[in-house]
C-alpha cells in the first residue's frame, strides 16, 4: 500500500511513512487508497484482541507478512504489558452505555494501546528501509503520550527518545512517571510553555533540512511517536473494531447495528481512529467529540470554523489542553474529498491567521459523522461524583468529560438514547488524585500517594502495580527549559549518544 501526504501527491511505501513520521511538505501520511468497507463482522467474531489486531493492521500495513505481523502484535499485547487478557475490556455502565477501558497497559493510559506496538513497527520499518542511522524519537506530550512512548522505546536497540512536556500542563502523577523513567536511551525535559508550543516546534523541526543534515552527519535521524505518525494512529483503530465485536458478543447490539462513540480528545487522534474504523466498515453511527474548556473542536463542529485565537486553559483534564489538534489535518483531508491542495491551503490559513473554515458542502460532510460538546472543570467533578455515587464506577477526569458530553448530546438529541453508546475511557483515575479527591470530597493528602491511599480506602479501587512501585523510584529528569532552547536540548542529547 502506498501512503501520500495530506498536502501533496508524492507516494511512499508503508515502511517509509512509519519511519519518517511526517511528510517532507509538512503534511501527514494517509493511505493513498483507503481500504474502505473492508471489514465484515465474520472477519472479527470470536477472535482475541490480538487476532482482531492482525486482521485490521493487515489492511493498513500489507507490507508485513502475516507471521511477522502476528509476532509483533503478540509481543506487544502480552500479559507482561497488560493487566487483563481482554486488553481493552468493555464495562457495562448502563443498559445502553458501555465504557471502553483503554488504561490497562503499563502506563495506565490509552496511549499504551498504540505505543506498545509502535516500537516493533518502527524497528521493522527501519530494517525494511535498510536504514543504518540511529533513530531519535522526538515526542511532545500533554501528559500520557510521553510516559507511554518512553516505556515503549526504553532500551530498544537503535533508538533513542526525547520527550518534552509543559511544566504546568500535566498532572503531578503524570510528571512523576516521566521524571522517574528508566532506560539508558531516554531523555525527558520540561518546558516553560504549553503542549502546543512543544508540538509546533517539533513539527517545524521535522521539516528543517539543515538540522536533519546536521544530525545525519552524526549518524542520527529524527522520527515521531506522536499520532502524526501513522504507526501511532493505526493500532488505535483496532480497539474500536474489537469493541464492535465485543458489543455483539455481549448481546448489546446485533450484527451491523449502529452504535455511537464518545471520545475525549485534544489532538484528535483517538477520535480519528474511530472514524477510520467506521470507514473500514464498523457500523459506528455518530462520533461525539468531547472537549474540556479548550473547546476549539466543539466550536468547529457547531460552526464549521476552527479558530485557535482564544485563551488557553490549564484544566483538570490536562491531556486535552490543546488548541492545535494535529490529527485534525487528516480529517480535513477526508472532508475535502481527499483534496491535498485544499488541505494545504487550510493549513496555510491556520498558520497565518490562526483559523480556518470549511464551506457549506464540506460542513454537511462533517455533520453527517460528527458532533461535539464540551465540559468545564466544575461539571467534570460533578460527573465523577454522580457516576461514582450512582453506579459505583470511578472515572478519571478525561473519561468524565466524555460522559458529560454524552449527557449533553442526549439532552439535545433524545433520540440518541435508543442507540448503544461507547464511552472511551482514556486513563486510570489514580493518575489524577487531586481532582478525584475534590470530586468525591475525600481528604487530599500531603503527597499524591497519600491522596491515592485515601481514595482507595473510600472507593475500594486498588493501586495499579506500576503506580504503587513508582513511589520508591528515584527522580532522574528534573530539568526545565525555555521553549526557545528545545533545539539545543535535542542537539545536546544527540551529542551524548552519538559519540
What are these language model-derived features?
Residues 1-499:
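PLP-dependent amino-acid enzyme catalytic core
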Amino acid at each position: 500500500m502506498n501512503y501520500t501526504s495530506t498536502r501533496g501527491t508524492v507516494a511512499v511505501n508503508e515502511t517509509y511513512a512509519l519511519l519518517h513520521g511526517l511528510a517532507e511538505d509538512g503534511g501527514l501520511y494517509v493511505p493513498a487508497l483507503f481500504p474502505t468497507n473492508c471489514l465484515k463482522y465474520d472477519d472479527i467474531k470470536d477472535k482475541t484482541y490480538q487476532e482482531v489486531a492482525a486482521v485490521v493492521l493487515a489492511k493498513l500495513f500489507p507490507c508485513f507478512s502475516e507471521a511477522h505481523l502476528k509476532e509483533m502484535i503478540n509481543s506487544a499485547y502480552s500479559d507482561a504489558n497488560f493487566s487483563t487478557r481482554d486488553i481493552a475490556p468493555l464495562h457495562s455502565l448502563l443498559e445502553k452505555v458501555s465504557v471502553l477501558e483503554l488504561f490497562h497497559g503499563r502506563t495506565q493510559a490509552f496511549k499504551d494501546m498504540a505505543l506498545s506496538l509502535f516500537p516493533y513497527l518502527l524497528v521493522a520499518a527501519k530494517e525494511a528501509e535498510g536504514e543504518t542511522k540511529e533513530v531519535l524519537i522526538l515526542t511532545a506530550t500533554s501528559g500520557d503520550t510521553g510516559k507511554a512512548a518512553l516505556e515503549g522505546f526504553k532500551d530498544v536497540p537503535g533508538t533513542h527518545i526525547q520527550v518534552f512536556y509543559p511544566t504546568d500542563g500535566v498532572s503531578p502523577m503524570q510528571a512523576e512517571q516521566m521524571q522517574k523513567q528508566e532506560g539508558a536511551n531516554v531523555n525527558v525535559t520540561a518546558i516553560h510553555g504549553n503542549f502546543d508550543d512543544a508540538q509546533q516546534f517539533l513539527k517545524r523541526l521535522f521539516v528543517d533540512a539543515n538540522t536533519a543534515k546536521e544530525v545525519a552527519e552524526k549518524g542520527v535521524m529524527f522520527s515521531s511517536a506522536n499520532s502524526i505518525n501513522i504507526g501511532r494512529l493505526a493500532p488505535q483503530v483496532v480497539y474500536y473494531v474489537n469493541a464492535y465485536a465485543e458489543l455483539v458478543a455481549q448481546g448489546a447490539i446485533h450484527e451491523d447495528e449502529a452504535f455511537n462513540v464518545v471520545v475525549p480528545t485534544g489532538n484528535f487522534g483517538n477520535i480519528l481512529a474511530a472514524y477510520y474504523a467506521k470507514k473500514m466498515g464498523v457500523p459506528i453511527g455518530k462520533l461525539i467529540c468531547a472537549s474540556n474548556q479548550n473547546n476549539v473542536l466543539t466550536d468547529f463542529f457547531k460552526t464549521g470554523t476552527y479558530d485557535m485565537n482564544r485563551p488557553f486553559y490549564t484544566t483538570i483534564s490536562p491531556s486535552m489542553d490543546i488548541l492545535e489538534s494535529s490529527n485534525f489535518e487528516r480529517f480535513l483531508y477526508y472532508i475535502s474529498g481527499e483534496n491535498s491542495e485544499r488541505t494545504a491551503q487550510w493549513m496555510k490559513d491556520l498558520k497565518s491567521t490562526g483559523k480556518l473554515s470549511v464551506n457549506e458542502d464540506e460542513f454537511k460532510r462533517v455533520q453527517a459523522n460528527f458532533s461535539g460538546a464540551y465540559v468545564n472543570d466544575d461539571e467534570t467533578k460533578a460527573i465523577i461524583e454522580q457516576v461514582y455515587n450512582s453506579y459505583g464506577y470511578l472515572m478519571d477526569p478525561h473519561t468524565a468529560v466524555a460522559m458529560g458530553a454524552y449527557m449533553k448530546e442526549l439532552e439535545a438529541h433524545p433520540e440518541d438514547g435508543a442507540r448503544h453508546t461507547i464511552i472511551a475511557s482514556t486513563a486510570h483515575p489514580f493518575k489524577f488524585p487531586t481532582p478525584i479527591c475534590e470530586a468525591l470530597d475525600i481528604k487530599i493528602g500531603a503527597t499524591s500517594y497519600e491522596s491515592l491511599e485515601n481514595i482507595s480506602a473510600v472507593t475500594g479501587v486498588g493501586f495499579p502495580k506500576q503506580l504503587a512501585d513508582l513511589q520508591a523510584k528515584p527522580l532522574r529528569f528534573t530539568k526545565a527549559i525555555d521553549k526557545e532552547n528545545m533545539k539545543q536540548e535535542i542537539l545536546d542529547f544527540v551529542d551524548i549518544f552519538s559519540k
